[in-house]
Amino acid sequence: LVQSVFDSVYDKYDLMNDFMSLGIHRIWKKNLINMMNPSIKSNLIDVACGTGDIGKLFLDNTRKNLSITCVDPNKGMISKGKEKLNNYKNIDWKVATAEKLPVQDNTFDFYTISFGLRNTKNINKALTEAYRVLKPGGRFLCLEFSKIQNSNLDFVYKNYSKLIPLIANFV
């Protein structure tokens, strides 16, 4: 079900994210990148990469010719990402799931997953894969929604969440 939703929205995914989050997702992603502080030899795997926002921010903010791998289970997302970031030659795009990454053990300094962990079929397996592909001392960074503790905000969030499918159809 989740993949069929992404199959239908990949060409408008970026616009949809901006619209649904009022652009706030960009601030969260920028903060994620700022937390990394990569070295000259750092590399990154971005899982559930969508159209490559995290990879682009990583390369733009490091201003280094670092190697990154962008992984998403949706071929349309990967295609849109390649099109959007065609000037970035050091991105290796892969169609795969978080539960079965087609990369060697102990490869990456950073593993990111943004708003994708909740969409995996098996969170424990996805986390095991993250651990497998990270180098010893590598960093796992995850952006994800969580339960709201404030009952007033929870009411707003739950009702807004019901609108998201309608918004997706509109966009």
Question: Whereabouts are the PLM-identified features?
Answer:
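A short acidic, Gly/Pro-enriched loop at the edge of an enzyme's catalytic core
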Residues: 99-111
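N-terminal, positively charged/glycine-rich alpha-helical extensions of SAM-dependent methyltransferases
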Residues: 1-14, 160
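Conserved alpha-helix/loop element of class I SAM-dependent methyltransferases that forms part
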Residues: 22-42, 57
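Conserved class I S-adenosyl-L-methionine
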Residues: 139-168
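A short glycine-rich, Lys/Arg-flanked "PGG" loop and its adjoining helix->strand segment in the class I
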Residues: 124-136
